[in-house]
Amino acid sequence: MSKSNATKNGAKERESFGADYYQRYYDNEETRVSDVSEIRRLATFVAGYLEYLQVPVRSILDVGCGVGNWQTVSKELWPQARYYGVEYSEHLCKQFGWQQGSVTNLNAKAKLGRASFDLVVCQGVLQYLDDRAAAAALKNLAKWSDGALYLEALTKKDWRENCDQSVTDGDVHLRSGSFYRERLGKHFQDCGGGVFCSRRAGVALFELEGE
């Protein structure tokens, strides 16, 4: 994927994520962006960090749950926690039985039976939204997170310097990291590693542990 293929903020929203998208980025071993073993390593870090921070995880909301890798590893790492998977793709909802919905307007209480969760996971979703929709999504993530949020969103710097463009979808809205940090900072403490603890959780961090 060349740099010129990365979408600018004015681009049209992608309306669907069908079988071809998931075949390329998740099923094909040569072109997939991640797999369950990678998510297991990541989730093991998140679980260990939250245990250290004394943030209990009894409920998990995975927004944009995709092919269900977080569900698989959540059963191993948090066996007592209840997992809720929400997915925008109609294709995946039919395949896996997820609750269909969007991070921009999901009514969690009405659709899932609860308004907030100990851990919210939102991985690789927000870069598919324009600025206004992404800002609305961040407000919702703050509303749903009682304990912690794990957030991953591709930024301009990531596209230039960090990601493997050969397997990363460049048809996205690239923004600066400050766009996310400024909005997250109102509601979360940045604990590092993509982990953000809700200010409602009352987590005490030493100065160099996070912001």
What is the predicted role of each segment?
Residues 1-113, 129-211:
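Class I (Rossmann-like) S-adenosyl-L-methionine-dependent methyltransferase catalytic domain
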Residues 121:
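A conserved beta-strand element that flanks and buttresses the S-adenosyl-L-methionine
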Residues 124-128:
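Short catalytic micro-motifs in class I SAM-dependent methyltransferases
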